[in-house]
Amino acid sequence: MRFKNRLFWIAAFIAFFVDQLTKYWVVQTFSLGETLPILPGIFHFTYVTNTGAAFSLFSGKVEWLRWLSLGVSLLLIGLALLGPVLDRWDQLGYGLILGGAMGNGIDRFALGYVVDFLDFRLINFAVFNMADSFISIGIVCLLLASLQKPPSSHHRPR
């Protein structure tokens, strides 16, 4: 039996694994609030927790985010299993989004928050994690996929 949408599953697994591994490393290595300058004033590892969405949007105790992560994950798994064979960019994009959604979703269900640690200070950006990065990269992949597809014609012949 041939495995349908193989790149989707590989991307999802790698994204999920990298996200969980990096969060585990941060929790084991740093105290909450501790920061390590990698490039001082530009990029730091800073251990914070986030009860909001990606990039600290909707900060606060937001219960619906755990269910959103679960719903997105289930929809993407259903698409990969039951839907058509996707092109490579779609598989990569949806797989990265699934890996990120599962990584943050598991944190929300198990901990009630997400571990964030990527701190770009040069642009004064919110602290985020690898799952957020994978979701963002996945969206870019889907945009690239949509640009490569020919526009569908909605004109009826006369």
UniProtKB/Swiss-Prot annotation:
EC class name: hydrolase
Keyword Transmembrane helix included in the entry's annotation: yes
Signal peptide as annotated in the record: none
GO BP terms: proteolysis
Positions of the catalytic residues: 116, 132
EC numbers for this chain: 3.4.23.36
Domain of life: Bacteria
Compartmental location: Cell inner membrane
UniProt entry tagged with the keyword Hydrolase: yes
Keywords tagged on the record: Aspartyl protease, Cell inner membrane, Cell membrane, Hydrolase, Membrane, Protease, Transmembrane, Transmembrane helix
Gene Ontology terms, MF aspect: aspartic-type endopeptidase activity
Membrane topology: Multi-pass membrane protein
Segments passing through the bilayer: 7-27, 38-58, 67-87, 95-115, 125-145
Catalytic activity: Release of signal peptides from bacterial membrane prolipoproteins. Hydrolyzes -Xaa-Yaa-Zaa-|-(S,diacylglyceryl)Cys-, in which Xaa is hydrophobic (preferably Leu), and Yaa (Ala or Ser) and Zaa (Gly or Ala) have small, neutral side chains
Listed pathway(s): Protein modification; lipoprotein biosynthesis (signal peptide cleavage)
Pfam families per UniProt: Peptidase_A8
InterPro entries per record: Peptidase_A8
GO cellular component: plasma membrane
Family stated for the protein in its record: Belongs to the peptidase A8 family.
Protein's job: This protein specifically catalyzes the removal of signal peptides from prolipoproteins.
PANTHER family membership: LIPOPROTEIN SIGNAL PEPTIDASE
Protein name: Lipoprotein signal peptidase
